[in-house]
């Protein structure tokens, strides 16, 4: 991925900068343009331009699609701006449970070696509620389903974690 991104960097940057959407509109054309621009961003994040491009994309976003695209790429590419952007997003959206579900899901898919510890710590976050199925799914479900390297770690720690969560869940809300 890094080699492809570096090889295509100039073309990706040209397309990315050419697509300018001033106002947010829900039209097929604008949706397609946002998708193309965010696809370019997803590759540019893995180049030496990644940190600056992703941070500017986040700061200039005027809609949740672009905001989450930048946050997603900062997280997946483990960019230096990641923690600052995650903290900013949390501060802005901490009182909106559905939006925070996105934040929890992103945290659970981090490529960090210590992601399991991060997920466990987030279970004590003020916006996390173990008895809220959406919150549990966004954090624990994202970890188990979308962070396969960490979940299937050779130590078995991901399996033990999920087992503990399921036992606790069965005691409090067996229908989930």
Regions found by a protein language model. Name each.
Residues 1-176:
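Long, ordered, helix-rich scaffold segments
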């Amino acid at each position: 991925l890094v080699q492809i991104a570096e090889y295509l960097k100039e073309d990706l940057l040209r397309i990315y900068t050419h697509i300018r959407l001033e106002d947010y509109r829900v039209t097929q054309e604008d949706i397609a343009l946002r998708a193309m621009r965010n696809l370019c961003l997803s590759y540019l994040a893995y180049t030496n331009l990644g940190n600056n491009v992703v941070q500017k994309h986040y700061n200039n976003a005027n809609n949740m699609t672009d905001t989450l695209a930048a946050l997603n790429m900062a997280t997946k590419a483990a960019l230096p701006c990641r923690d600052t952007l995650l903290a900013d997003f949390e501060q802005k959206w901490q009182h909106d449970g559905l939006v925070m579900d996105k934040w929890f899901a992103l945290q659970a898919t981090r490529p960090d070696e210590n992601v399991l510890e991060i997920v466990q710590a987030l279970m004590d976050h003020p916006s996390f509620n173990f008895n809220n199925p959406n919150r549990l799914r966004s954090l624990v479900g994202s970890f188990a389903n979308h962070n396969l390297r960490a979940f299937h770690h050779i130590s078995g720690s991901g399996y033990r974690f999920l087992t503990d969560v399921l036992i606790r869940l069965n005691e409090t809300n067996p229908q989930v």
